[in-house]
């Protein structure tokens, strides 16, 4: 895959296994983990579908729950640590360890110089999302970086379930896949909580203490939406023309 050398994995006999795509918790699963019933969750969804206003108390409750979820993300070990300790510090420790585990997996399942390139792409995502225009730029990794040298690294991370890729469209027309500009795209973390844990200390503290999702020029909002769409089975696309973005 464009220069990526996957280490050999023992093959499985065709027809003797079933594959499942596993992702971190979404907001509904977070609420279930918090002890809310499916009936309560369905009622919440119905209110939104009907555009019925919540009471002030309901609004504040669900707002706080969503902000908590936005900072924590949906990794099961992180949610478990938070529910057991009722504080973000323990959850943040788990998040940072998971990030290190991801990097160890890159070293384990990729080979040669590709290891370095994959890690460079992964580690640069938070800084790239901090830009006003969040299109991923290889030149922000190195002034001499070229797309043909790094594109396979992006696909490696995407296939591994570590990131989500949002493709730019030449035209906002169907079929979307047929209108993709392969040289323009945005990259998001597959779990928003891990993005929060990857930010610089000041931004991370602001999010954990004050839950200010406006830091990083709206990157957290974009990552949350991308995460939610992918978990619902949608592909990610954007369209930019002149000075406007759709």
Q: Where are each of the predicted segments found?
A:
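Conserved Walker B catalytic segment
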Residues: 1
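Accessory nucleic acid-recognition modules appended to NTPase machines
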Residues: 79-246
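Interdomain motor-coupling "hinge/lid" segment immediately C-terminal to the ATP-binding subdomain
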Residues: 6-130
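Conserved protein kinase catalytic core
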Residues: 4-5, 197
